[in-house]
Amino acid sequence: MSSMAKSPDMRTPGCCSPLRTKELLERQRSSRCTPAKGYLTPRNCQSPKHPEMRIPSIFVTDADYGLERPKQLLQRLERSLYRSSSASKVPPKHSLLASQNRQRTWEGPKTPEFRSRTNKTIPASEPRPRRAKELLEDLRSKHQGTPATKIPSQRNPKENQELSKSHTCIPSSEPQPIRPKLILERERQESITNRLASTSIDRLKTKPPRSSFTSSRLLVPQMGFSYPKDPKRLHESDKGIKLTTSKRKLDFKTELGTDWLRRELEKIGKEWRKKTDYQLRQLISGFVKQLVRLLPFNGITFSHLSRDCYVQQMVEALQQLQYTKKVNKSWLQTPNSTQAIAHVLELLNFLLDVLEHRKGEGMCALPVVSEKQRIEQLASASGTSYDVMSLQQKFENIKIEKERLNNYQESLMPESPVSKDMDKVTERDGNQDFVRLLDFQKETLHELQLQRLRLQEFSELVSLAKIKLKRCCKANKQCIEAFNDQIQDLADCVVLRNRNIGLLTQLHLNDNPKEEELHERMKQLQRLYEDNYSNLLQLNIKPPQGSP
C-alpha cells in the first residue's frame, strides 16, 4: 500500500489519498460546467442544481467525473468548431443526439488491471475533423451563394453520411464558438480603425479604406502607400491581387560625369544667349550685391559703419585685398551702366580669383609675390624688356635717395648769418679749386689717351712680329727637315765612300740650330764634296759655283 500511495499512477479510485491541486481545480470547474471554458467534460452530471451540464454542441453522458487528456480534448474542440461552422448551412433534423458511445475516459490509474476499463476508443462513426482547405472551400461557397449540397458531393458517401449525422446532432439555437484568430483580428481591426480615424481628421483628401482588414503594419498612411484590397472581394476577380505596397523608386545620381556637366553648361549658355543686354546687366548688379555676403567668410573684416552699405563694404574689401587699379563708388552703385560695366567685370574677376584661393576655415590666401616677380609680371604685361624696367626702377630708387640726402643736408645746415658768409667764401674757394682740378684732370686724361694709343700701336707691331716669327720658325723647321732627309739619302747612297758614313750621320741638324753649328755643317759638306768629286762627276752632278 505504501508504494501505491507514493506513486500517482498506481492510485485506485477508492483510495483515500489526498488529491492534487490540479485535480481539485478541474473537478471544481467540471462541477460548475461553464460553457465558455471547454477544458473539462463532466459526464452524467445529475445534481439537482444542474440537471444538464454541457458545452455547446457537445452532450455529456452519464458517467463518473473525469478528466480528458490533451489530445482527446483537442480533437473534441476541433469537432465542436466544425459543427458550429456547418450548423448554419444544414438545418437540424433531430433535436438532440443520442450518446452513441461518446463517453470520455478518465485520467485514472495506468495499471494493466484498470487500463482495460479506462482506455475507451472513439468509434468509427465519429466525424473526422475537417482540414483547412475544406473550410476555405466552405467559406467561398457561402459567400458565392452556392447550395450546401454541392460540397458533400465531392466527398465519399461515407463522409456524407457522417456529415448528415453531424448536422442533425447540433441544434441551431446553440451559440456558435468564435475562433481565437477571428477574435484577435477583430480587436486589431478596431484599434486600426480608431487610429486611422484620429490621424485622418486633418487630412480631408485621404479616403479611408473600405474595410479595416489590412496586411500591412503601417497604421498611418505614408507617401507611396496603397491600401490592400478587401479579401471578401478577391473572389470577384479571376486573378487575385497581391496585398503589397507600391513605393516610388527614386534614382539619385551621386557622381556627375563630364557629359552631364557639358550638357548643363550648354543649357546655361543657351539661356544666357536668349537674354538681352539689359537683363545681363541687371543680373550682374544683383550678383555684385550678393557677393559682399561671401567676403566675411574669406578673411575680410568690415567696419561698423559699412554694414548696411554694400558699396562701402566692397571698397573696404578691395583695400584689404590690395586691389591695384582705380575704384569709383559710382561704378558699384550703378554697375549696369555702360561706363561702369567693364570696371565691374574686372572687380568681379579679381574678387572671384581671390575667393578661389582660400585655405583653412574660409580664410582667403593671397599669393606672395616678390618685387622681382612683380616687375617681371608688369614687363610681360606691358611688352617692354626686363632691362628697361630694371633701369626705370633703379632711376626711381636714385631719385628717392637723392631726395633723402637733400633733406638731410638741409636739416644739418645752420641758420646763423656768420655761417652763411663762411659758406659763401668756402663756396668761392671751393669752386676755383674745383675748376683747377677739372683742368688738370682733362690734361691728364688727354695724356693718358695718347699713351694708350701708343701702347696700342706697339702691341700691334709686336703681334705682327710674332706672326712673322711663327712663319719663319715654321719655314726653318721645314728646311731643316728637308736637309736632314737629303743627308740621310747621301748616307744611303753607294757612291760615297764607306769611311765617310760616320760623318754623314753627324750632319743632321736640330730644330733650333745655332750659327756655329751651321758653319760646321757647311765645312763638313765642303770636305765631303772634295773627297767625292770624281764620283759626283760620274753621276753628272754639277759642282757648286766657286768650287774647284
From Swiss-Prot:
Region (Disordered): 1-51, 82-181
Compositional bias ranges of the Basic and acidic residues kind: 20-29, 104-116, 127-141, 156-165
Residue ranges of the motif SXIP motif 2: 168-171
GO cellular component terms given for this protein: kinetochore; perinuclear region of cytoplasm; spindle microtubule
Compositionally biased region (Polar residues): 144-155, 166-175
Subcellular location field: Cytoplasm; Cytoplasm, Perinuclear region; Chromosome, Centromere, Kinetochore; Cytoplasm, Cytoskeleton, Spindle
GO molecular function: kinetochore binding; microtubule binding
Important for kinetochore and microtubule localization as annotated region, ranges: 100-253
Key words, A-Z: Centromere, Chromosome, Coiled coil, Cytoplasm, Cytoskeleton, Kinetochore
Protein name, UniProt field: Kinetochore and Eb1-associated basic protein
SXIP motif 1 (motif): residue ranges: 149-152
Highest taxon of the lineage: Eukaryota
Subunit structure: Interacts with Eb1 via the two SxIP motifs; the interaction is not required for kebab kinetochore localization.
Disrupted-gene phenotype: No visible phenotype. Flies are viable and fertile. RNAi-mediated knockdown does not affect mitotic progression.
Keyword Cytoplasm attached: yes
InterPro entries noted in UniProt: Ndc80_sf
Chain coiled-coil ranges: 386-457
Region CH (calponin-homology)-like region, which is not required for kinetochore and microtubule localization: start-end pairs: 237-372
